[in-house]
Amino acid sequence: MFKVPPDAELNRRRRSRGKDEEIKRKTRHLVVVALAFVMVTSLGSTVGRAQEAQIDRTELPVKGPWYPPITTLDARDAKAPPVFEVKAPKDAPNVVIIMLDDIGFGGPSSFGGVIETPQFDKLASQGLMYNQFHTTALCSPTRQALKTGRNHHSANQAKITEVATSFPGATGMLPNDVASIGEMLRLNGYSTAAYGKWHETAVWEISPSGPFTRWPNYQVFDEFYGFLGGETNQWAPSVFHNLNRVETPDDPDYHFMNDMATRAIDWIRFQQALTPDKPFFVYFAPGAVHAPHHVPKSYIEKYKGKFDEGWDVIRERIFEQQKKLGVIPPDTQLAKKPEDIKDWNDLSAKEQKLFARQAEVFAAYLHMADHETGRVIQVLEDMGELDNTLIFYIFGDNGTSAEGVMNGLYNELTYFNAEPKGSDIDFMLQYYDEWGSPTTYPHMAAGWAVAFDSPFTWTKQVASNYGSTRNPLVIHWPKRLKGKGDLSNSRALCITFTPEKEKIS
């Protein structure tokens, strides 16, 4: 067996120790998340060019400029230096990251989908689309990787927070020497806010007792309004405003997604009214279309009868439209669906009726998410800020969820509690008219997940297949992105996030 010579081994260990010491010395260095807006802003400016020349922005917090000692004997003759204040540069863009939940490659209509997504499509027609943007196969890892620019294992988020363990890389506890986008931008002069789903804090740290060191405000978002876990009841959510649990209105028309959009709009307006020269960063993450699929009936009615043809026909229709739009090569072959997914024509009439209803509610939920996202985008346009706002619209944090198993669930919790009646067809048909209402907590049959992940085979959780890890992305920035509706097939990953950066810079 080959053995490393003693001297070489000693030198290797010295180098390793040296690297460890270097890492320790730089524990407060922020992760350079490879987002285009960081490069474009050149990390900002401050009061006066003379100060800027003395500022080192490779380490955060930014240290103030050095001033020579004031030796004037008479204080009346002494001249005070200018007040140091870290500011983003003039015309630095606002930044908005939109991340939907549990929807895959065949979701938006711009990517061949059969569900209406007008806001995504509008941005796509005016911006740059990516058809090879990759996420991880699960919620928490994707979100942590996106915000830190680290491999999700390096950020201790190897799996979702609910099943975190004490094994290295899987604790669900962000290391103290890993920074987030919120911290990086806030320390460079941005106002920062996060709305909606978080799902990045270990479950034993999300009670009102804390500890709060890995909550959104400590990562460091000035404002947070949302839920900390992987899902919540959209009619009666568990919501936190910053560190405080809040009671939502006792209103039959209340829906969290509408509420979070309104909160984001109000914050943007308030921030701009007080500090119009200060750019902002908003992370907007609806709970849709993660179960429970809760949505008002007015949205469901739009899709009545739209899925009666079944998942096989819908899957093929999405596939053909994808080829027509050019988001997949024209010679692409539709992958075989999993063997466990029955052909639609082999299902009973009862099964077809129930499953079609499940898809109608799912589609309505996605449509609502896109609509509420559009409300936030509209306020940017109304304020004259849209042209200089860099928007990343990420259509899903992984593939579409097949966690509704073969028959779907009227109440997702029946599955987790091993209640067999929860997936019984006759039992669930009792809730046909109520599907999506406050009396249900529903999920859909796995066959629909396969259809909405066309042209791939698998779905969320299957990291070895693109159906789980490839998601549509649109980058929109009218002031700097000149291409309109262009499609890029450059490979990109949620931790790098700067494919074809020359097109943005």
Identify the meaning behind each predicted range.
Residues 9, 22-23, 35-37, 51, ...:
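Intrinsic disorder/low-complexity segments
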Residues 5, 9, 13-34:
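Bacterial N-terminal signal peptides that target proteins for export
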Residues 32-42:
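Bacterial N-terminal signal peptides
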Residues 42, 50-505:
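Formylglycine-dependent sulfatase
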